[in-house]
């Protein structure tokens, strides 16, 4: 498989299965966690030397994707700065937004949507630019960023963990992620890859962060010590079952399924705290768990069809690259059939678990 940074993206365009149309879960999570951003902005202004007022505030949205999410974030930042400057009787600084994602992101659609923000804040001096690249590496100059934000992106790994035995044969057969039936080596490999990636992310953001700046990260996580619990693994188990069916029909090569693992990890709060402490350059100012009901008749996705569209918009690019674009409709149709049966018997995962953390640079 090619490097993740060259393959991973959300579904582009504005069609039924596009990220713009099908992904609304992140917007819901953003609404729940919205108060975090104004607090981070407030800290930036109250802790900065008043004798040297900020003239430009640099803000980054890492893994911004496309659609209403980055636009909502930009609006929240502008409103927060307007309010704080009004309270302090200070002149409004200029705001520079850096919209970051991998090169496959639909930046054209993203920038077309900026007209909404332009119309709303005509009297505010703000600017936006694309910053393509992986947040697992350096993106910005040292000490330059005042607010770095990411919502539902940093659970993506820089690469899929290497899960083979000494002979080079795949260990996670019939699966595309950790599961209850996966050997312990699979779980260990995923944790190791996440530890490496998250530690790098912390190191690079610390280098880029201005004094008194903040890093706000919101990402898929888990509440239990077991990384193979149902709420964590259900989506990937569902897709693996659908792929196994295609294998049984002779439509997918079994070796392609056995050798494929998604570059993704749901950490726990304990794992995050441990890695922040171990890396040592940042400190946790705030951390909390978000629980969103998504399954069943009263959940966020009340129908199997809407839930599969929500999954398809962020899983299809990876799966299409591995198994072929021509099979995607068959794959997600089969996944829908499986999910319909799971809904009937109450077997589907019912919760989406997120973790929100605010970080600041340690003072030397």
Curated annotation (Swiss-Prot):
The keyword GTP-binding does not apply. Binds 1 Mg(2+) ion per subunit. Pathway: Alkaloid biosynthesis. GO terms for molecular function: metal ion binding; S-adenosylmethionine-dependent methyltransferase activity. Theobromine binds at residues 26, 152, 155-156, 314. The record marks 149, 220, 264, 325 as: Involved in substrate discrimination. Its EC number is 2.1.1.159. It comes from the Eukaryota. Its cofactor is Mg(2+). GO terms for biological process: methylation. Mg(2+) binds at residues 172, 258, 260-261. Keywords: Magnesium, Metal-binding, Methyltransferase, Transferase. Belongs to the methyltransferase superfamily. Type-7 methyltransferase family. PANTHER family: S-ADENOSYL-L-METHIONINE:CARBOXYL METHYLTRANSFERASE FAMILY PROTEIN (PTHR31009). Involved in the biosynthesis of theobromine. This is Probable 7-methylxanthine methyltransferase 5. It comes from Theobroma cacao.
């Amino acid at each position: 498989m090619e490097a993740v940074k060259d393959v991973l993206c959300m579904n582009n365009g504005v069609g039924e299965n596009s990220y713009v149309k099908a992904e609304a879960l992140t917007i819901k999570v953003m609404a729940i966690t919205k108060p975090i951003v104004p607090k981070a902005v407030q800290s930036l202004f109250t802790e900065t030397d008043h004798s040297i007022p900020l003239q430009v505030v640099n803000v980054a949205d890492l893994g911004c994707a496309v659609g209403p999410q980055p636009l909502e974030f930009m609006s929240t930042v502008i409103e927060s700065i307007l309010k704080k400057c009004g309270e302090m009787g200070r002149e409004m600084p200029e705001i520079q937004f850096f919209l970051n994602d991998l090169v496959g992101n639909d930046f054209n659609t993203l920038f077309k949507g900026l007209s909404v923000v332009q119309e709303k804040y005509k009297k505010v001096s703000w600017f936006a630019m694309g910053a393509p690249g992986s947040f697992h590496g350096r993106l910005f100059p040292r000490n330059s960023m005042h607010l770095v934000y990411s919502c539902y992106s940093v659970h993506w790994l820089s690469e899929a963990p290497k899960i083979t035995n000494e002979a080079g044969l795949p260990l996670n057969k019939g699966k595309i992620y950790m599961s209850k039936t996966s050997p312990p080596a699979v779980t260990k490999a995923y944790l190791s890859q996440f530890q490496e990636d998250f530690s790098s992310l912390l190191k690079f953001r610390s280098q880029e962060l201005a004094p008194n700046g903040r890093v706000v990260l919101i990402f898929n996580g888990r509440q239990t010590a077991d990384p193979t619990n149902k709420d964590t693994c259900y989506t990937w188990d569902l897709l693996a079952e659908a792929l196994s069916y295609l294998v049984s029909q002779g439509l997918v090569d079994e070796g392609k399924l056995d050798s494929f693992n998604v570059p993704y990890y749901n950490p726990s709060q304990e794992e995050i705290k441990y890695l922040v402490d171990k890396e040592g350059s940042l400190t946790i100012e705030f951390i909390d768990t978000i629980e969103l009901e998504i399954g069943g008749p009263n959940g966020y996705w009340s129908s199997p069809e809407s839930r599969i569209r929500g999954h398809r918009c962020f899983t299809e690019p990876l799966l299409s690259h591995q198994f072929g674009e021509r099979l995607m409709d068959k794959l997600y149709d089969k996944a829908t059939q499986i999910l319909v049966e799971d809904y009937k018997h109450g077997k589907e995962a019912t919760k989406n678990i997120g973790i929100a953390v605010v970080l600041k640079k340690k003072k030397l």
